[in-house]
Amino acid sequence: MKIALSALLLLLLGDFVATFLYHVPEHVFGRFHTIVHHSPRRSFVCYAWLNRQPTALVFGFFGFFSYFLWVPLLWPLSAKGVLLGLCLAELHVIWRHQFSASYSTPAWMQRLCRLLCITTPERHWLHHQNANLAYGDIFTFYAVPAQHWLKLLRKLKKKLHYRLLA
């Protein structure tokens, strides 16, 4: 039970931090995420290497760090659960980036993911096509609050921009 609880907490908390403190703000204030993750190459490592921009790796690290920062808190609850959660998070990253035209998530798995509010590759592809949609790295229930956060941050950016010009 502790294994499952710590794995689930790591995924929930990590996805929350990744969505609201990294991913959405990066779409508003940053540039590397959009250039790298929403480009045809889709790789922080490839971008950093090919364009001689090692700082791009820092932004790739932020996505990972959102999950890793919970390790000290959850490790005492269950080390195995933490390791399971980190493995599941990484496997989900790999799975949700299946953008081959021939790939289709099996119908039974789509139903299960919808029931558990888990992002599928098809849903994640919506985000790559339109950066205003389908937020939440792992969990779909973060999408609507993330869209509100996105709008709020854009308004804040606009206000800051006007203040700097004044």
Report each predicted region and the residues it spans.
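Hydrophobic transmembrane helical bundles of multi-pass organellar membrane proteins
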Residues: 1-166
